[in-house]
Amino acid sequence: MGKNTKAKKRAASLEVLASKSSPILEFVFDEPLIHVACHPEQPIVVCAIATGHVFCCKYDAKALKRILNKNEAKLAALENKDDQKRKRFWKLIKLKAEMDTYELEEGEETAAVELLWKTRRHKGSVRGMSFNNDGSKLYTIGIDNVLKKANSLTGKVMKKVTLPLSSEKNHYTKLVTSKTHPFLLLGDELGNIHVLNNDTLQLQNTIKSIHNGDAINDIFQFVGKSVYKFISLGQTTLAYWDSRESNESDASIPADDLDAKRKVYVSDDQEDEMICGSFVNPEDGDILVCGMGEGVLTVWKPKKNDLVDQVTRIPICKNESVDCVISSFQDDNCVYCGCSNGNVYKVNVKLGKVIEIRKHSSIDEVSFIDLDYEYRVLSAGMDKVKLWDIVDEDDDEEGKINESYSNSESDNDNGFDSDADSNSDSESVSSSDVDSASDDEENSKSESEANESDVEETLVGLSKDELLAELEKDLQSSDEDSKHYTKRTKSTQPKKLKKQKKELNNKQLRNLQKHEHGIRKFEGL
């Protein structure tokens, strides 16, 4: 009886987690995808591959949605349910280096997707790519150490400059443009930050060896501080600095002098690789999260400890890595993160748990995640890019189910105030591949995905029904895996128990009537 109740709770949790959104557009490549970026104001996506080619595509979201609905209606008429699952019903486009235009498919009157331009932008792989604040300019840096500025609608190069590095083994790893001021930042494999004017492409400042000589994994603006202050991630540390100031003076400060004022402030060693980061709400800058190599999001609060150390952590996917993260920009305390297991997770940082899962691929990781100009999620790996449909949330029923289920298992809503709070809040999704109770808890989802077939099904992304079916398989395996720690779980999980009232015996009843408590006063003693 207990097992059935537990299975029902697990199934309810999985149903809430499975996203209602499905892809409306997919790009596939015959060469490894190196970078992808969405235009901030138009339905345009730019993809760069390992050969140095860059593709700029414009899409019509409404036309793509009509194609999706039309194909879904056709598939619904099929009697064979297996055929329904194995069919792809969104738009698929193959982008190849030798193609010049995109040809219309049979029965397609107007193109839902248009190839604006394609060019070989660099000799060798593209290492970084970014739009300016209004999307009119596109900046790219290649393995050839050439930085180029181009018109994003035509692809025509407006300016280029060669930026040689001190070592031939050193390469640029990250390109970020300021959204408010005319400068851009380049990070390299030796932990250096190069600041350039984005009009003239002239070098303005260099901040050297920030993360003990390790590569720059991510750069983003320090929200709430000066527009010139940024945060960088590298190896096992987080650092923040002013892009206008050099850190040459830091070299003369002894390492054990903790009171000295430095140009670069570095966090404590996190003993885990810090891969990506983002502020939860880019408007206030109260909380930021960092994706880690061990499959967790670490939560940081600048106003609490000046980014000396993480405040708490949110387990996402055990034995995997969180490779990319971005704010939902919906003022809902949520972020989207992509993981090496091919899933995209929507995480409520305040509650400290995953609230939605999307399956990008079963054989490829999610290396990039972005939002288009209408806040559609775009996920990308080494071989494909998927643009996801917007789900109309006309009611909050799903959120209420999720929240009430969490409250039944937990006493606290504040997922980022302490480790204990985070673990308690995320108890409700412990049956899925979200490992939210503790770092040592079993992760049935990640383990089951490790045994998936090496050949992906014709269906490259999963619908909600198929995702549920796939997650349900985890329940059977997790039941067997959980037998050996059932006793430990029962003993460690807090439960609210009703206290049973004991019946009073005759002596207690008599003392109660006489207002005595078993202790008598002895006069004159």
Curated annotation (Swiss-Prot):
Feature: compositional bias, Low complexity: 425-435
Keyword terms of this UniProt record: Nucleus, Repeat, WD repeat
Residues in the signal sequence: none
Segments for region (Disordered): 396-525
Gene Ontology CC: one annotated term: nucleolus
Subcellular location as annotated: Nucleus, Nucleolus
Biased composition (Acidic residues): 410-424
GO process terms (BP): positive regulation of transcription by RNA polymerase I; rRNA processing
Biased composition (Basic residues): 485-501
Coiled-coil stretches noted in the UniProt entry, renumbered to this chain: none
Skewed-composition ranges (Basic and acidic residues): 463-484, 513-525
InterPro entries reported in the protein's UniProt record: WD40/YVTN_repeat-like_dom_sf, WD40_repeat_dom_sf, WD40_rpt
Main location: nucleus
WD repeats: 28-69, 121-160, 211-251, 270-310, 358-398
Family: Belongs to the WD repeat WDR55 family.
PANTHER family: UTP15 U3 SMALL NUCLEOLAR RNA-ASSOCIATED PROTEIN 15 FAMILY MEMBER (PTHR19924), WD REPEAT-CONTAINING PROTEIN JIP5 (PTHR19924:SF31)
Protein name per Swiss-Prot or TrEMBL: WD repeat-containing protein JIP5
